[in-house]
Regions:
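N-terminal, positively charged/glycine-rich alpha-helical extensions of SAM-dependent methyltransferases
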Residues: 1-33
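A short glycine-rich, Lys/Arg-flanked "PGG" loop and its adjoining helix->strand segment in the class I
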Residues: 142-156
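Conserved acidic residues
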Residues: 63, 107, 126
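A short SAM/SAH-binding and catalytic strip from SAM-dependent methyltransferases
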Residues: 126-140
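Conserved SAM-binding loop and adjacent beta-strand
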Residues: 36-51
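Glycine-rich helix-loop-beta junction characteristic of Rossmann-like nucleotide cofactor-binding loops
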Residues: 53-60
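Class I SAM-dependent methyltransferase SAM/SAH-binding core
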Residues: 66-118
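Short conserved AdoMet
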Residues: 59, 101, 138, 152
Length: 158
């Protein structure tokens, strides 16, 4: 396993499971240039698996999808591969978003602060993907309420 920090696995995990939004942003800013290579090299299959599962529950793959915590765009690539055509991504890391822009998978990409309301309208999306996002240090559980509020009534969150 390649680690983006030279100070060992324990310190790396402490950074991944950071306590503040600033800590999380700092981690992903540093990790952005090696993230795809590192997670790909470790067999990270979550984006492809989640995209396939999500597509099996959506009747219109042309409707807009919000990729909440889009990172470098790995999930956007996976969502496109299963047929989703209209993707919008938001993430806390401007460095990760810059890499996602290079992949050309999204109609729009925005950087946001998870401690304030996301830069999209409430009820704007039928489908929201937060692939590999919810967890301590990434998007803590209180973020759920903010994400769910963005869905149309009866919308799908994965």
């Amino acid at each position: 396993m390649t680690i983006c920090f030279t100070d060992g696995m324990e310190d790396f995990l402490d950074k991944v499971y950071a306590n503040t939004s600033d800590d999380t942003r700092d981690l992903y800013a540093k990790w952005s240039t090696s993230y795809d290579q590192e997670v790909g090299g470790n067999g990270y299959a979550t984006p492809a698996r989640a995209a396939k599962a999500l597509a099996s529950h959506v009747t219109n793959l042309n409707r807009p999808v919000l990729d909440y915590g889009c990172g470098t765009g790995l999930s956007g690539i996976a969502l496109r591969a299963v047929g989703f055509s209209t993707l919008h991504g938001i993430d806390v890391s401007k460095e990760m978003v810059a890499i996602a822009e290079e992949k050309k998978a999204y109609q729009t990409l925005r950087v946001f602060d998870p401690e304030v309301d996301p830069p999209v309208k409430i009820g704007e999306f039928d489908t929201i993907a937060a692939i590999g996002v919810i967890g301590i240090g990434a998007a803590p559980l209180p973020v759920f309420d903010k994400i769910i509020a963005l869905l149309t009534p009866g919308g799908l969150f994965a």
